Design a protein with these regions (language model features):
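Acyl-donor-binding surface of acyltransferase catalytic domains
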Residues: 41-42, 48-145, 149, 267-269
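Conserved acetyl-CoA-binding loop-helix of GNAT-fold acetyltransferases
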Residues: 78-88, 216-232, 250-251, 255
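Conserved active-site alpha-helix within GNAT-family acetyltransferase domains
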Residues: 104-118, 244-262
Length: 278
């Protein structure tokens, strides 16, 4: 039903996914980075080759912390997707997992979960916002501000402020992001981060946060602009997912030149959430 791609096939799949942008953005972005950076092990599976209809990026679940690293999925054929979810062993529906994919697959996930008798819910629904031309970023004044990158000593701080964090199993995800992908932060006079933004394994930028006592100083604008330029220079796509309820972040990214694709929404589905959040 599904088989794993080789290193050479991953490069071919990256080029193939460009044809389906923006719908394939997250899986495409993941392969762009995966083909250039070696981080945590991930299996990339397809239903057939080379004309695949379903492609999935699935982290290894060797440790409990690995379960918090989302699987990513892109499909051009809903019927094939439903068959794979229902009949293959790609996902163990008796355990916790989270999948990021198109919101258009909502009914498929609900139906398969219902048939298997397990709880499944959508935990996020987001706008896809991309920056097509980095050179058109508006100028930002960072004079007198210390901008750096996050390091491993900052994992706990990021985890405690991320809305999906505050649990031990999120630490592995954040550690992987800080160790392997670009990040930016503003440091105070004592060298401690007061505002930061990270890059996910898919290339999406996010986890943007500023400590309450440092808000209103323009730090978020500086960090989004800085990380966008850094990722672009590395050849990564520059984009972000903004929750539909997050009007503040939407305005920030829009004012920096990011544009929303009105035809597409990304969603995250969680199965057996009680195993992580009892």
């Amino acid at each position: 039903m599904a088989f794993e791609l080789s290193e050479d096939q991953l490069k071919t799949a990256e080029n193939e996914l460009k044809k389906y942008l923006p719908m394939s953005q997250q899986v495409y972005g993941f392969l762009v980075i995966r083909n250039r950076v070696r981080s945590d092990p991930v299996r990339v599976l397809v239903d057939r080759w080379p004309q695949f209809r379903v492609i999935m990026c699935k982290p290894h679940g060797e440790q409990k912390s690995d379960l918090f690293k989302d699987a990513l999925l892109f499909a051009t054929d809903a019927a094939v997707l439903e068959e794979i979810l229902s009949k293959s062993s790609v996902f163990d529906w008796s355990k916790y997992f989270c999948v990021g994919t198109s919101v258009s697959h909502t009914e498929i996930f609900k139906a398969v979960a219902s048939a298997k008798g397990v709880p499944c819910k959508r935990v996020a629904k987001c706008y896809l916002m991309t920056l097509e031309d980095v050179s058109r970023l508006p100028p930002v004044d960072s004079s007198g501000i210390s901008v750096s990158s996050l390091d491993e000593s900052h994992i706990g701080l990021v985890n405690q402020t991320w809305k999906f964090g505050k649990v031990d199993v999120a630490v592995g995800l954040i550690r992987n992001m800080i160790a392997n992908f670009p990040s930016c932060c503003v440091l105070d006079a004592e060298g401690k981060p007061v505002s930061w933004i990270l890059t996910y394994a898919s290339g999406a930028i996010g986890m943007l946060y500023t400590l309450p006592e440092h808000r209103g100083k323009g730090y978020a604008k500086i960090l989004v602009s800085s990380l966008a330029k850094r990722n672009h220079a590395l050849g990564y796509p520059v984009y972000s997912f903004i929750g539909e309820e997050n009007a503040v972040s939407y305005r920030l990214f829009a004012n920096l030149g990011f544009t929303e694709d009105p035809s597409y929404r990304e969603a995250w589905f969680v199965v057996n959430e009680f195993q992580i959040f009892p």
